[in-house]
Amino acid sequence: MQDNSSHSRESASAGDDPLGIDKLTVDYDYLLYKMRDYVQSIQLDTTELCKKQNEVMVNGIIENTIDKNIAKFKELLEKCDTLENHYEMLNQLAIITDTFKERIAEAVNNYNSLKKGASKSK
């Protein structure tokens, strides 16, 4: 009995948003959240690395620390690349939404043409 009621709720909610705009909105918000999280992570990592590098310079401890810092800077660059990929996703979303607007307008025009044709034949 519960399966039927949950299925009918899913059908109703799918009927309320057949184009999946709500899911797209949630996905967009999540992408922005991830990007903000990446920026904060990069900021913290950069600050930490700069502080460590300053300690190395001040204390004169240069041996293995530089190699470790280079490895951490490489990780930081990878995070920046990931962030750049997220910005590219946003650009792709902008392109998709622009073409989506055009397709909706075309669908409305086609519908209106069909509606006019159906009313003339009656």
Curated annotation (Swiss-Prot):
GO biological process: endosome organization; regulation of protein localization
Record region (Disordered): 1-21
UniProt keyword annotations, A-Z: Coiled coil, Cytoplasm, Transport
Cellular location(s): Cytoplasm
Coiled coil start-end: 63-95
Transport is among the record's keywords: yes
GO cellular component, one term: BLOC-1 complex
InterPro entries tied to this protein: CNL1
Note: Present with 589 molecules/cell in log phase SD medium.
Similarity section: Belongs to the BLOC1S4 family.
Role, per record: Component of the biogenesis of lysosome-related organelles complex-1 (BLOC-1), a complex that is involved in endosomal cargo sorting.
Subunit structure: Component of the biogenesis of lysosome-related organelles complex-1 (BLOC-1) composed of at least BLI1, BLS1, CNL1, KXD1, SNN1 and VAB2.
The name this protein goes by in its record: Biogenesis of lysosome-related organelles complex 1 subunit CNL1
Organism: Saccharomyces cerevisiae (strain ATCC 204508 / S288c) (Baker's yeast)
